[in-house]
Amino acid sequence: MANILVLKSSILGQYSQSNALIDGFLADHQSDTVTVRDLATLNLPVLDGELASGLRGGDNLNERQLAVMAQSDELIAELKGSDLVVIAAPMYNFSIPTQLKNWIDLIARAGVTFRYTETGPVGLVENTRALVISPRGGMHVGSATDLVTPYMRTVLGFIGIKDVDFIYAEGMGMGPDAQAKGIEQAKGQLETLAL
């Protein structure tokens, strides 16, 4: 039995292809312990100067900083306690959803999920794999317009998650036939993963 953390980030609700793919994946993992975070409804704060300063810690934190520090600690504990994190990362304007970026800003903390050394940064999230599910309106895999894959691989690797699989559902905005084909290909990729 595995501990699975699921991060949904689509703003499309019931029309979300990434949510539908995740739900299909979870149907095959009912014996696992699953925590689902819908980042689109969680209203995580956008990082600003006050919050960035607060996330570094200290003795003189204000109420807002203390609340966000507690929220960050909770999100990090969920992540570190997971064997697998399943991340919905649909491509919006060549990037990830703001809601997912807000989560990343709260869990990427020096001394907590990574540390700097003389030889470079070292990730502190250990024994966790990641599965990134990324629907896209067009065809972007392997091209310069795919900014999602290198970003997610880099940020996850930076905090210590090196074992990352990507599932792509491409052509979601190219008509019903392309959409159906993209969904079927993504489902096929999910079925072949040994997770």
From Swiss-Prot:
Enzyme Commission number, as recorded: 1.6.5.-, 1.7.1.17
Group of enzyme by EC: oxidoreductase
Sequence positions that bind FMN: 10, 16-18, 91-94
Reactions catalysed, as given in the entry: 2 a quinone + NADH + H(+) = 2 a 1,4-benzosemiquinone + NAD(+); N,N-dimethyl-1,4-phenylenediamine + anthranilate + 2 NAD(+) = 2-(4-dimethylaminophenyl)diazenylbenzoate + 2 NADH + 2 H(+)
Cofactor note: Binds 1 FMN per subunit.
GO MF term set: electron transfer activity; FMN binding; oxidoreductase activity, acting on NAD(P)H as acceptor; oxidoreductase activity, acting on NAD(P)H, quinone or similar compound as acceptor
Cofactor dependency: FMN
Keyword field: Flavoprotein, FMN, NAD, Oxidoreductase
Database matches in InterPro entries: Flavodoxin_fold (IPR003680), Flavoprotein-like_sf (IPR029039), FMN-dep_NADH:Q_OxRdtase_AzoR1 (IPR050104), NADH:quinone_OxRdtase_FMN_depd (IPR023048)
Assembly with partners or alone: Homodimer.
Similarity comment: family membership: Belongs to the azoreductase type 1 family.
Function per UniProt: Quinone reductase that provides resistance to thiol-specific stress caused by electrophilic quinones. Also exhibits azoreductase activity. Catalyzes the reductive cleavage of the azo bond in aromatic azo compounds to the corresponding amines.
Name of the featured protein: FMN-dependent NADH:quinone oxidoreductase
Species for this entry: Aeromonas salmonicida (strain A449)
Lineage: Bacteria, Pseudomonadati, Pseudomonadota, Gammaproteobacteria, Aeromonadales
